[in-house]
């Protein structure tokens, strides 16, 4: 069952509050971010795992490279093990407990729209870059979703847009190859991420877009 135009569906995770709304068009501006809900040729939903967690990236942006880290403990569960080790190395006092060795920062593939690009050209470029040129697009879906995400950890709001993207590659074509992209460390099936905090709303996004092809 889908949502009608402008109807809003809300999801909440320990970190995020996400509003999902179906819209007619994606606005074109320098701040527009577009993402693809990618479906493989054999029907699997794809998701990317970032090389760096958003929490660690935010900490780095606020710190001098030689400084002692000041880190809220509520951020620790949203970081990679190697990032936690780096924080522990710089701790003046305290310790890090309850590390989740299986944490991954899941994201939809896509990025920021260039002013000279169409929406679909932007997605083709981003998918090519983030997959080390392994992903090629067969066709795009017709439904557009607006995602409004409030990051409760940093009290910031992000707006992005998403559409389905059916690709020519199978899951096996993509899952057994290394990726050297600066942002993405791995591309995998969303079906393998059922224990992730983001799984529920990411699954909803895929179901909305795919079933409305």
Curated annotation (Swiss-Prot):
Induction description: Expressed in the early phase of the viral replicative cycle.
Motif Nudix box, residue numbers: 111-132
SUPFAM superfamilies found in the cross-reference section: Nudix
Active site residues of this protein: 126 (nucleophile)
Enzyme type, top EC level: hydrolase
Coiled coil, from the record: none
Annotated binding of N(7)-methyl-GTP, by residue: 16, 50, 151
Binding site for Mg(2+): 117, 126, 130, 151, 183
Catalytic activity: a 5'-end (N(7)-methyl 5'-triphosphoguanosine)-guanosine in mRNA + H2O = a 5'-end phospho-guanosine in mRNA + N(7)-methyl-GDP + 2 H(+)
EC number(s) reported in the record: 3.1.3.-
Role noted for this protein: Decapping enzyme that remove the protective 5'-cap from both host and viral mRNAs to commit transcripts for decay by the cellular exonuclease XRN1. Accelerates viral and cellular mRNA turnover to eliminate competing host mRNAs and allow stage-specific synthesis of viral proteins. Acceleration of the turnover of cellular transcripts may even promote the shutoff of host protein synthesis.
Name of this chain's protein: mRNA-decapping protein OPG121
Record organism: Vaccinia virus (strain Copenhagen)
Lineage of origin: Viruses, Varidnaviria, Bamfordvirae, Nucleocytoviricota, Pokkesviricetes
Gene (name only): OPG121
